[in-house]
């Protein structure tokens, strides 16, 4: 396991951004029930951790993608993270809505991109990958090239990994499900018996049910 994955997992657990509720699962926008929830937006309320996330995402953008013309954040969770990274890199920033505004200019992309720009998308969390890749499609329709995506966290579902592969979008993340579970177990945040529930959910999250 990479040091960054473990380190960020430790930081998320320290601020209680990881929630485990097998008996009272969370419902995601996709409709999936989940005993596990990562609320990494809480990092915004901790200045030192906010700076850590900005620095590490910025570093990954530079190391993995080289020449970048603009940063795009996926609304709403990745707007602040994306803006911080764009500021650190002195690059233009835009954010992509899930749906166009129903008034005014009815924009889907807020900000200005020019055709031919090389864009890196910043996302706060990857689950199924659906909303993230819709943002990619919107940017491509504007005539820009999406050269990659950096996310703070991913659940690492096979359906998402395949979707990113099909869309030809390289994805890098600060941490992931496996790293969080490993650190959570070692630090006593979860118990061994919790692992079985979490593993059952991970195998088939679309059909997982409480107590099954």
Curated annotation (Swiss-Prot):
- What EC number(s) has UniProt assigned to this enzyme? 2.4.2.10
**Which SUPFAM superfamilies did the record assign?**
PRTase-like (SSF53271)
* Residues where 5-phospho-alpha-D-ribose 1-diphosphate binds: 97, 101, 103, 123-131
Q: Which PROSITE patterns match?
A: PUR_PYR_PR_TRANSFER (PS00103)
Functionally, this protein is described as follows: Catalyzes the transfer of a ribosyl phosphate group from 5-phosphoribose 1-diphosphate to orotate, leading to the formation of orotidine monophosphate (OMP).
Q: What class of enzyme is it?
A: transferase
Name of the molecule in the record: Orotate phosphoribosyltransferase
Which keywords does this chain's UniProt record carry? Answer: Glycosyltransferase, Magnesium, Pyrimidine biosynthesis, Transferase
Describe which pathway this protein belongs to, using the record's wording: Pyrimidine metabolism; UMP biosynthesis via de novo pathway; UMP from orotate: step 1/2
Q: What NCBIfam families does the record tag this protein with?
A: pyrE
Q: Which GO terms describe its molecular function?
A: magnesium ion binding; orotate phosphoribosyltransferase activity
Keyword presence, Repeat: no
Q: Provide the assembly information.
A: Homodimer.
Q: Where does orotate bind?
A: 127
The record's comment on protein family reads:
Belongs to the purine/pyrimidine phosphoribosyltransferase family. PyrE subfamily.
One protein family per Pfam: Pribosyltran
Q: What is catalyzed by this enzyme? A: orotidine 5'-phosphate + diphosphate = orotate + 5-phospho-alpha-D-ribose 1-diphosphate
Instruction: Tell me the Gene3D superfamilies matching this sequence.
Output: 3.40.50.2020
Superkingdom, taxonomy of origin: Bacteria
Required co-factors? Mg(2+)
- What GO biological process, any one, is recorded here? pyrimidine nucleobase biosynthetic process
Protein's organism: Bacteroides fragilis (strain ATCC 25285 / DSM 2151 / CCUG 4856 / JCM 11019 / LMG 10263 / NCTC 9343 / Onslow / VPI 2553 / EN-2)
Q: Does the keyword Glycosyltransferase apply?
A: yes
């Amino acid at each position: 396991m990479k040091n960054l994955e473990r380190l960020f997992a430790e930081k998320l657990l320290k601020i209680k951004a990881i929630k485990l509720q097998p008996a009272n699962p969370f419902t995601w926008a996709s409709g999936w029930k989940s005993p596990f929830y990562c609320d990494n937006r809480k990092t915004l309320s901790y200045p030192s951790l906010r700076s850590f996330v900005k620095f590490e995402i910025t570093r990954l953008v530079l190391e993995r993608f080289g020449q970048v013309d603009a940063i795009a954040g996926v609304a709403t969770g990745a707007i602040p993270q994306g803006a911080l990274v764009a500021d650190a890199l002195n690059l233009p920033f835009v954010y992509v809505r899930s749906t166009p505004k129903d008034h005014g200019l009815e924009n889907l992309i807020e900000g200005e991109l020019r055709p031919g720009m090389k864009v890196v998308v910043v996302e706060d969390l990857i689950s199924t990958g659906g909303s993230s890749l819709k943002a990619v499609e919107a940017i491509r329709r504007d005539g820009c090239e999406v050269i990659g995506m950096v996310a703070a966290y991913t659940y690492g579902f096979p359906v998402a990994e395949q979707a990113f592969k099909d869309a030809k979008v390289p994805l890098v993340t600060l941490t992931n499900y496996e790293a969080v579970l490993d650190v959570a177990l070692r630090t006593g945040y979860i118990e061994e018996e919790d692992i079985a529930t979490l593993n059952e959910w991970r195998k088939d999250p679309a059909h997982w049910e409480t107590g099954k």
